[in-house]
């Protein structure tokens, strides 16, 4: 895809077309992640009254389907991750009790961990997976089951939240600017090592200059050195929100002319999109922004 070729892994497929998209892009040299396209609602519970909720059953469809197309050569489940953006920036945004929901869902043994444990139990008694075990062996099958339990859940924060880092099983994804302190960087790294997890970073409306951004009004130097900074700080992944947004945040119901209106979020022109519609100029593929150079 256009974004893969620019070293960006996007997610744009849902439902039945999702697995097809995963398989189709696996041979791209820049392929490195598989977004599981289930969005946890703010009130998500793995169980209710001792019975898996309908939300859990819906999420399991994706997890189990991905696990059952794995082979020793193509371990798709190793690339999988969740991104529950209903929990975004829970440290500053109390919409829908985000902080409380994050604690319930992401604490060790919380609702996400319970859902993944159920996925493993379902696979163990699944006939298709039993056939994979017979074909590829116990070592392969056990690796798939272990990988399911380790599927990361990205959790974005604006600030360093030490208690959360210590007690949640999420893969933390704070603002890139948080890593300016050696103490903070070491804390993230230490906890990630203990939990066999990763540390990500992200940028969106913030942080702003002098931190590197993908904003149109920033120097292009920023887009180039952000990767260097991530390497320096030992950051494993980078999240950008978002790459194909066609709405102004003040009018979500209304598309904008993307060649005339640079604003998706006030005060951060360029945030929310990294490509332009190619059809406008007769192209069947999106046209990448110079910010992707």
Task: Identify the residue ranges that each predicted region occupies.
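A short acidic, amphipathic alpha-helical/loop segment
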Residues: 164, 183-192
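Active-site clefts of carbohydrate-active enzymes
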Residues: 195-223
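Short, glycine/acidic-rich beta->alpha junctions
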Residues: 177-184, 217-223
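Generic beta-sheet signal
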Residues: 156, 175, 202-204, 240-241
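Flexible loop residues that form catalytic
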Residues: 39, 177, 243
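Glycine-enriched alpha-helix->loop->beta-strand junction motifs that scaffold or abut catalytic
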Residues: 166-172, 194-200, 234-237
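Aromatic-lined carbohydrate-binding surfaces of glycoside hydrolases
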Residues: 1-169, 207, 247
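Aromatic- and carboxylate-lined catalytic core of secreted/periplasmic carbohydrate-active enzymes
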Residues: 211, 226-293
